[in-house]
Amino acid sequence: MLSPKKTKFRKQHRGRMKGSASKGNTIAFGDYALQATEPVWLTSRQIEATRRTITRYVRRGGKLWIRVFPDKPVTARPAETRMGSGKGAPEYWVAVIKPGHILFEITGVPQKTAQQAMKLASYKLPIKTKFIVRNTTES
C-alpha cells in the first residue's frame, strides 16, 4: 500500500475540497486516462485495488502511471473511547482528489482494451469517473 516514508507532521486538519483541480488535470504520460468527476478522499487501499484491476486486465502489455499519491493522514479513535483526551492516532492515508484530476494513465494497448480496463477500474472507486483520450494535435 502507498504511504509517505516520512512527513513533517504526524497529523493534519481535515480541510475542504473546494473547486476543481487546477494541477494534474491533463494527460501527461500515457495515451488514455481515468479522470475524476467528483471530489473524494481516495484511500491507499482503493488506489491499490484499482491498480491491480488495470494490470490484471492488460496483462503484460501496456504501461500504467498512477497520478495520485496518498499523502494525507486520517486519524481515528479506538472503538468505545470516551470523548476528549486529544486527537486519535493516524489510521490510514488518503489522496485528496478534486473534480478533473487525472487518476490513472495507460499506454501501449489498443483503445478498446484501455477503455475496458478503466471501466473495470472505476468499479473499485467510490466516485464517478470519465475515460479520456490524449489529443493527437498536442505535442
From Swiss-Prot:
GO MF annotation: an example: structural constituent of ribosome
Signal peptide: none
Keywords linked to the UniProt accession: Chloroplast, Plastid, Ribonucleoprotein, Ribosomal protein
GO CC annotation: chloroplast; mitochondrial large ribosomal subunit
One of the GO BP terms on file: mitochondrial translation
Subunit structure: Part of the 50S ribosomal subunit.
UniProt main location, coarse: plastid
Protein family according to the UniProt entry: Belongs to the universal ribosomal protein uL16 family.
Pfam family, one: Ribosomal_L16
Residue segments, region Disordered: 1-23
PROSITE patterns noted in UniProt: RIBOSOMAL_L16_1, RIBOSOMAL_L16_2
Coiled coil: none
Skewed-composition ranges (Basic residues): 1-17
Gene3D superfamilies associated with the record: Ribosomal protein L10e/L16 (3.90.1170.10)
Name the UniProt record assigns to this protein: Large ribosomal subunit protein uL16c
Subcellular location: Plastid, Chloroplast
